[in-house]
Amino acid sequence: DGTIEENTDAMSTYYRSIILAGPSAKGQELLAKVNNGEELTWDDLNSATWAVMGPTSASGYIYPSLWLQERYGKTIADLDNAVQSDSYTTSLARLASGQADVMVSFGHIRTKNAKDWKEKLGGTDEMVNQTGIIGVTEPIYNDMIAYSKNSELMQDEDFRKALGDSFIELAETDEGKEIFSVFSQIGYEWGDDANYDGERAAQELLKSLN
């Protein structure tokens, strides 16, 4: 819609991966279809050159593969033209130059790199004018505090609740914020086991690739 995504001060328990179309003719063709409300076909996507990360990258390979699998029964491994990049910066440079038609990355890639698009990456116009999102994955829940089901101590539900509440309360203090900032975390919420169904699917996908 002509605007770059904005960061938020609100706490989030997940992030998403996106499929980003670039300024090449093919990239703009795919973006135009999406903006017109048309469904992309597998042939549409397979006709593009993709810039991807290594197969262990959550946002740069695994979750985009799950997105493809859910819609087309395919993964990144099935694409005819998928080029592995050594960094997201490399993928962006390939996208800007037209070497790649689409790339996959963490969702805030444009927020982080809009300024560098023209100055350092080779874009010929503002990033918001040359790129567009054509796909968004399921949430990626990559940070959590977990417990072992084999622990006798953790069998006590009251203890688990008290421990969880302690982490939540500690993260709300200035001292706690300083401690948890080491992990780039700003707070905690109670989780839902169903939130991690996507991660279970990701693990199954990884097994199938081995």
Where does each model-flagged region fall?
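An extracytoplasmic/periplasmic, membrane-proximal ligand-sensing/linker region
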Residues: 152-210
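Short helix-initiation/N-cap motifs at beta->coil->alpha
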Residues: 76-93
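Hydrophobic residues within well-ordered alpha-helices
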Residues: 45, 95-96
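Secondary-structure junction motif
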Residues: 57-67
